Amino acid sequence: MAASTSHLRSLCSSTRSLSRSGVIVTPIACRGYATTDPSPSATTPTPVRRRTTFKDKLNAGPSFSDFVSNGNDNAPLDPSEAYALKTALVGPAGRKKEMTRLPSWLKTPIPDSKNYQRLKKDLRGLNLHTVCEEARCPNISDCWGGSDKSSATATIMLMGDTCTRGCRFCSVKTSRAPPPLDPHEPENTAEAISRWGLGYVVLTSVDRDDLVDGGARHFAETVIKIKQKAPSILVECLTGDYAGDLDMVKLVARSGLDVYAHNVETVEALTPQVRDRRANFQQSLRVLDAAKKAQPTLITKTSLMLGLGETDEQLWDALRQLRAVNVDVVTFGQYMRPTKRHMAVHEYVTPDRFELWRQRALEMGFLYCASGPLVRSSYKAGEAFIENVLKKRRAASGGAETIGERPVAVDEASR
């Protein structure tokens, strides 16, 4: 420390002696960077890397798609190979479990189209819900992603997004005390549908056992509002069972809708394991029967899931009972487990078997049957056929409404 101090003093004394001798000492005021850009003349060209034998082999070798297809892109598959289910080990090391992969015929694209974004924006803006989103429907990219307004379809879910029942196959939220009904929902729903310019719309709802009428009047009011804004639109209503209150079923059936749908979901023997304890197969049959008797011109419709462990004889029995109450349309679709909390899939039914049951249903006298792994009760493939049938019926009757077809007010329909 003493040495550095003496050195500093000697520097200062030398500076003072220079100033006394007439020499002006100017401090250096320039700065420079640690590194500077080299001049163009100093820039050396980057040497070109020599092509290697390894790189040549890669360029001449198989592409990524060849690896994915395993080299069998054009090789025909027999049914046993095409429908073979693959497995994979899933989980942390030491605790891996063998899981069955989703079959290729059940895979769908991720929704991302202009129509999809438009429908979603309209629904959120009007505070409306859809069963497409709540039930995690695999067809949402297809139904919402049409190339124009007329081909896009959304199934609007009325009375909120919370159900009072807890079926073991359904992913809709449940609660014993869901939020109260939105009094503006009928008007908002009619506004959304008129904005989309659709020719066919599907309405459904959660079960509301907390309400005296199960929400039937709210449902009927929505149909009436839609018909007031767009008289030519065809309306399908997928309703609950209203706890077996057939007067409420008749109220909705007489509200002016065109298709009355109520799903039995599965065969009678499996109903206690699949559906909520407050629902049963015979009660669902009575709902469909009451709707047809209240409005004979209605098309009645129901849906069953396959892959829950049902037998052929149980399916035959279910179809016979449905035809006995004059159900017009039936659909078959693959049950797909929404979460680990729900029922496990017993079987992935092949497309060939779905086609077999479609033919059997038509032979039994059903007006129409949509059957396939991805078919759902409100899938748009069925709507196109039903729309044509309804238009032909209207044309045959001269387009005039009969007294039985006239939509009535909610209070009048409940009498």
UniProtKB/Swiss-Prot annotation:
Its main location: mitochondrion. One of its GO terms (molecular function) is lipoate synthase activity. Residues 148-367 form the Radical SAM core domain. Keywords: 4Fe-4S, Iron, Iron-sulfur, Metal-binding, Mitochondrion, S-adenosyl-L-methionine, Transferase, Transit peptide. It is an enzyme of class 2 (transferase). NCBIfam families: lipA, PRK05481.1, PRK12928.1. Residues 1-33 form a transit peptide. Its cofactor is [4Fe-4S] cluster. Binds 2 [4Fe-4S] clusters per subunit. One cluster is coordinated with 3 cysteines and an exchangeable S-adenosyl-L-methionine. It catalyses: [[Fe-S] cluster scaffold protein carrying a second [4Fe-4S](2+) cluster] + N(6)-octanoyl-L-lysyl-[protein] + 2 oxidized [2Fe-2S]-[ferredoxin] + 2 S-adenosyl-L-methionine + 4 H(+) = [[Fe-S] cluster scaffold protein] + N(6)-[(R)-dihydrolipoyl]-L-lysyl-[protein] + 4 Fe(3+) + 2 hydrogen sulfide + 2 5'-deoxyadenosine + 2 L-methionine + 2 reduced [2Fe-2S]-[ferredoxin]. [4Fe-4S] cluster 2 binds at residues 163, 167, 170. PROSITE patterns: RADICAL_SAM. It holds the Pfam family Radical_SAM. The keyword Cell membrane does not apply. Pathway: Protein modification; protein lipoylation via endogenous pathway; protein N(6)-(lipoyl)lysine from octanoyl-[acyl-carrier-protein]: step 2/2. It is found in: Mitochondrion. [4Fe-4S] cluster 1 binds at residues 132, 137, 143, 378. This is Lipoyl synthase, mitochondrial. Belongs to the radical SAM superfamily. Lipoyl synthase family. One of its GO terms (cellular component) is mitochondrion. Its EC number is 2.8.1.8.
